[in-house]
Amino acid sequence: MDKKIIQVAAGIIRNEFGQIYLTQRLEGQDFAQSLEFPGGKVDAGETPEQALKRELEEEIGIVALNAELYERFQFEYPTKIISFFFYLVNEWIGEPFGREGQEGFWVEQHALDAGQFPPANAKLIHRLLNETHNFI
């Protein structure tokens, strides 16, 4: 049986201080209580960037003004394959908050811990931790 491929677009919401906005997955979801980058499934007829902008508004109440593709990869789970599109978002309108009841908070980029995220995020976390940025 072929595994279903699901496209997911998520945002790396990074402020001028080098902090990244994360949310915590709700009870009842896969990987409940894990941290995640805000985003969600790409709907039929949408591009990943369109899905990202829609999901950011729905989930955390911001309007992304820019979105640069940062990382794209697939991760295979026992029953499905997730095709991830991670976008770096440095400009937005609004203050992010958990519109769907999830906790949200800012974390220093250098303090990201892959163990707090679903396994699919390990590669992305590794790349973010290896970056060097000058946030002024």
UniProtKB/Swiss-Prot annotation:
Top enzyme class, one word, equals hydrolase
Q: Which InterPro entries match?
A: Mutator_MutT, MutT-like, Nudix_hydrolase, NUDIX_hydrolase-like_dom_sf, NUDIX_hydrolase_CS, NUDIX_hydrolase_dom
Q: Which reaction does it catalyse?
A: 8-oxo-dGTP + H2O = 8-oxo-dGMP + diphosphate + H(+); 8-oxo-GTP + H2O = 8-oxo-GMP + diphosphate + H(+)
Names of required cofactors:
Mg(2+)
The keyword DNA damage appears for this protein: yes
The UniProt keyword set, sorted, is: DNA damage, DNA repair, DNA replication, Hydrolase, Magnesium, Metal-binding, Mutator protein
One GO process term, biological-process aspect = DNA replication
Q: What is this protein called?
A: 8-oxo-dGTP diphosphatase
Q: What is the primary gene name for this protein?
A: mutT
